[in-house]
Amino acid sequence: MWFKNLTVYRFNKPFSVDPDSLEKSLEDFTFSPCSSQDISKFGFSKAMGKHGETLIHTAGDRHLICATKEEKILPSQVIKEALEEKVGHLEAEENRKLTKKEKDALKDEITTTLLPRAFSRRSQIRALILPEIQMILVDSSSAAKSEELMALLRKAIGTLPIIPISFKTPIETQLTEWLKEGKTPPAFEMQDEAELKSDSDEGGIVRFKQQDLSENEVLAHIEVGKQVHKLALHFGQSIAFVLQSDAAIKRLKFSEEFRADNDDLGNDDPMARLDADFALMSSELIALINAVVDALGGLEDSI
């Protein structure tokens, strides 16, 4: 349940959640496994997995949702080889070249034949809906997968007035200033990893890992015009992460000490522990996002 990445959206119109109403809306779009002829299926599943019973898990005004995706694994090379064999056989038999339309029809026929025998894989993606700060946090490093979940949520509830989070000042400008000065805002501590890019196509990219970022070797790249597009940071004593210039927060890792705060609950009641961990995680993520927004100079005015 502990989030590992954050793609952040903000509401550009006031948004509130009624848990019972949202639960009913999601029920119409619940996940069901692929049938023999389905290439993929995507739908909402239990927010707390096998330990929960509902599609939304709520604590205060924080709401967790989860979606499951099943995809058939049908390698393109397998289809290509089967198609080439079929086309070759028919062209030899009929002594003519098949048209593109005929080849496309054969490809569809081959795909339909192979689908029932294809293996499938499942993945899950979670999101935290936070009306108290008017944001949604998606646990994904992929913008495309995050958008897919938001599209499903929008379809379920009818409207979802969100935009990707953006800031008044370009993030790379702030990150570059922090690295250049060797100083971050009080809530954060710089770690030993960064990626710098040049504005020009010829300037290239340089990455540093497990290195003192205050060294002249690093700062020299800023002097020649490169800007910091990724920077590893630590938030207080709780979360390590990498902040990117596209506002994505990746490789989110909660410290063992922080995660141990609920150890006194034990594991006799898994749902009680999950509920406590959810409250702990969501509170700290809200604190992290608020601190990031403050450190970067505030959000860009919504349109």
Curated annotation (Swiss-Prot):
It comes from the Bacteria. Keywords: Cytoplasm, DNA recombination. InterPro entries: RdgC. Signal peptide: none annotated. GO terms for biological process: DNA recombination; regulation of DNA recombination. It is found in: Cytoplasm, Nucleoid. Its main location: cytoplasm. Disulfide bonds: none annotated. May be involved in recombination. This is Recombination-associated protein RdgC. It comes from Shewanella halifaxensis (strain HAW-EB4). The gene is rdgC.
